[in-house]
A protein has these predicted regions:
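Conserved active-site segment immediately N-terminal to the catalytic lysine
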Residues: 245, 264-280
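Conserved N-terminal alpha-helix of the aminotransferase class I/II PLP-enzyme fold
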Residues: 106-154
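Conserved PLP-anchoring active-site segment centered on the Schiff-base-forming lysine
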Residues: 161-180
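N-terminal "arm"/small-domain region of PLP-dependent enzymes with the aminotransferase-like
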Residues: 2-36, 43, 47-117, 246, ...
Length: 280
């Protein structure tokens, strides 16, 4: 009788255990997820430890940068968080005062009413408006160029330009003191990269001679170098470009609008308007 009961129980168990199989799978899955999460947490802790050590080293070196929070409009005099007094602003690029121009502020308000807030898309899909095209036309006309493309920042423009036009058959020849964004943009492209000594035309000519077998050569320079304020010798650069059949590209971030008799930047200032291939 006892043996029969045990056999009967085993028979019932064989019928029931498949019902618990999904539950077992769920428990096992949760266990694996918890183990994975535990591993991520441990790795995250290691990363935090490494980051904190790096930050401590930066602070110890005296190079840690706190974010400066401005509580007023951009202007020559601004107010910043943590100070009750106005301070002089020497580090913005608001050379012409356009950031706080009453006319531009009013135009921006009108644009909000007519076009709304934000584009809700990238330009390539459906984010280009008639205002973009009008401004691009006016900028191109102002500089005497064929066309213009707007970017959200000069850094983005420098990052996107070189890869779009040049490949391994080409050479980009850059002044060694060009802005970091220019250097990064050149690194992103596949062209062969060369640097000439700062504003050294003999060194530039040496590289132009060495690269004559390549498809395109593009000489790249700041118009006005933002750190030192010196002006690129554009006439000499353009003369060399003509001599060796090279292109000329300049960054006008720190000269357009106020350099030259009519504010058309270093090409006007140096008398080489019409000889520059690309202006950023």
């Amino acid at each position: 009788m006892e043996i029969k009961c045990h056999l009967h129980a085993l028979k019932d168990l064989n019928l029931i255990w498949p019902l618990f199989l999904p539950l077992f799978h769920c428990v096992y899955y949760l266990y694996l997820r918890m183990a994975e999460r535990l591993s991520i947490t441990k790795n995250g802790a290691k990363l935090n430890e490494a980051i904190n050590k790096t930050l401590d080293d930066i602070r110890a070196a005296g190079t840690f940068k706190e974010e400066r929070v401005i509580t007023s409009k951009q202007a020559a005099e601004i107010t910043v968080q943590g100070s009750d007094e106005k301070v002089l602003n020497f580090c913005a690029n608001n050379y012409l005062g356009l950031a706080n121009s009453p006319d531009l502020i009013e135009a921006a308000k009108e644009a909000l009413d007519s076009h709304g807030f934000g584009l809700a898309s990238v330009r390539f899909i459906c984010g280009t408006t008639d205002m973009h095209k009008e401004l691009e036309h006016l900028i191109a006309k102002f500089h005497g160029m064929e066309d213009c493309i707007l970017y959200s920042s000069c850094f983005d423009a420098n990052g996107g330009f070189f890869e779009a036009l040049f490949n391994a058959e080409d050479a980009v020849i850059s002044d060694q003191l060009n802005h970091a964004s220019i250097i990064d943009g050149i690194r992103l492209c596949k062209a062969q990269r060369y640097r000439y000594n700062h504003m050294d035309m003999e060194d530039l000519e040496r590289i132009l001679k060495e690269t004559q077998n390549l498809r395109y050569r593009c000489i790249v320079t700041d118009g006005v170098f933002s750190m030192d304020g010196d002006v690129a010798p554009l006439k000499e650069i353009c003369d060399l470009a003509d001599k060796y059949n090279a292109l000329v590209w300049i960054d006008e971030s720190h000269s357009a609008g106020f350099f030259g008799k009519t504010g058309r930047g270093t090409p006007e200032y140096c008398g080489v308007q019409g000889r520059i291939d690309f202006i950023n």
